[in-house]
């Protein structure tokens, strides 16, 4: 028996189960007959071999099925483009099937020959189109849907995430593509039903890109790079290289207290930058009423401070208060304007009797606001606080001893210290500030400061809704815009502003404006004399290296008490005359020279055709902006409405504001002062943008990096005064969750896709400000939001 087992094992004929069973047989009583023992061995061996064979067969079957599955999967992957193409082909075949119905609809639409009348003016007649010469529609060509899918994927950077905001954004983009190709509603619906699912699903390019990104060689390269960023400790180095002299020397140095080896690392020099102001390189034009007095003194360089690494690619700078800048500012912004050939010429004058056309508006306004009287100096002071009140208190005391004089209306001019967008215009004409003596402002303010509110409400009543957009929160402005939009069946918004409004305010315009004030104050002789001094302006411009004396007739002076009110009054009156004379119903949003008018889409052609010519009759150069058929694309005061999930909020254009808010015209006296300034900007910004994509994270980043700072002093400082601060004073928004509706609305407003919004927010949420000044002349730190590289 033992000999037989040895034979089976040595011969390799028995498996482990066979050996176990034969061993069990061998343990039987040896008194059994040999035939019985052999019979038992034969049975055990046969059953064991059968059992092992069945196991082998099962394993082979599993392996075979797995191999077959792999082959089928590979074949299926290779077949995926074919399936996608078949889906696209199916969609195009469906489009072709309804071709006849669509042609019939188009022919019915082309048979309309009725004249369209806007108000009292006809703007065109539909004419019949011969089907034989009708242009071939590109959407009927076979690769059209495939082209739409590729365009959309390129726009969204591949396959977008399946979020609600992305689905809406993709649908909107596909719809706009169909609209550009003049697809009819039937065709657009069919194309969207096919293209949108394809865009939201990965294709072979998406799969291949992800596979390449996670391939072994690229994964290994990334791991190698991460590993090389650090060095092993000296003990590990010695264990791995026991025969290396350098390893032993490194170990001995460490044991002796000498510095250890360190991996290469860039020096972090901080992100606070100090930029020097600049002087214009342009010198042209002269005027007989302007006399220069250069002085041999150095130019005082202004400073502009910047928080680097957080803004967009838009760059800003500041003009120095130099004689060259002052001269160009007066020549190009007071005495002359540019024509179409970029040549200087005097500002256009209004047509004779043009402002007589505004008599109806003036009388209607007077019937609403009624008559008023001047207020006392004390009541005037109650309108102000802080440093401005202190200045006016000194003027009031001065007037108690000496009444206002003609020389108090003379101008004291200087170059405005403001953030200049040098990316948009590298060397623009500097703006100048032309204030009069505060004694004169107090006397005019006693009449007009309180009256300003009544004037605005009167204009609102004439326009049948809020029109002068001053003193409102960003939510209130959004609601005003939405209410005006919803009051029309097929609304369109047309933006326009006047080129250098102050410069084009002629003497005739000032006289008409003054007549409105005099009507309200019963033609008060003292007020009439004060206002008359604004018709002929004498002034002296002061620079660090010289001065300029000049005289100009008319023009709006930036420091006058009635500058903002007068600009709004003139703009609203001229615009109202345009629509009233043409019988067109419209709503206006105005903030001085910045205007947006909302009307029916069928009226847009008349507005765009005649608006520029109408304003030219009053001596103004009107510039039309792109009309908006999507509510979120209305632009007013560099803001657009964004839906936060509950209501519309006006949001500043992040392509510019993210950079502009990182610059400071006021001085940073040290790192602690810079911290306070950054904190103040963050608090102001968050009060305007809480719950809004991207910008909420931007301002939260500023607050998070300055948590232990008290910025109340900065918020009151005169160097921090701006429209941004005044708007933020009215805001009370808080940081909160961002809804999918807000992301989609933000995409409609600014073109930033939801996925890109989340990516930028992740960058800002993880960003740490390095509090240190960068040496002057060093290149700017690369912004983390470099993707926003357009104006």
Curated annotation (Swiss-Prot):
GO BP annotations of the record are: viral RNA genome replication
- Gene designation: ORF1
Q: Which GO terms describe its cellular component?
A: host cell mitochondrion
Where is the RdRp catalytic domain positioned along the sequence?
491-607
Key words of the record:
Host mitochondrion, Nucleotide-binding, Nucleotidyltransferase, RNA-directed RNA polymerase, Transferase, Viral RNA replication
Taxonomically, the superkingdom here is Viruses
Q: Name one Pfam family in it.
A: RdRP_3
Q: Name it.
A: RNA-directed RNA polymerase
Q: Name one GO molecular function term.
A: nucleotide binding
Write out the similarity annotation: Belongs to the tombusviridae RNA polymerase family.
Q: Which EC numbers does the record give?
A: 2.7.7.48
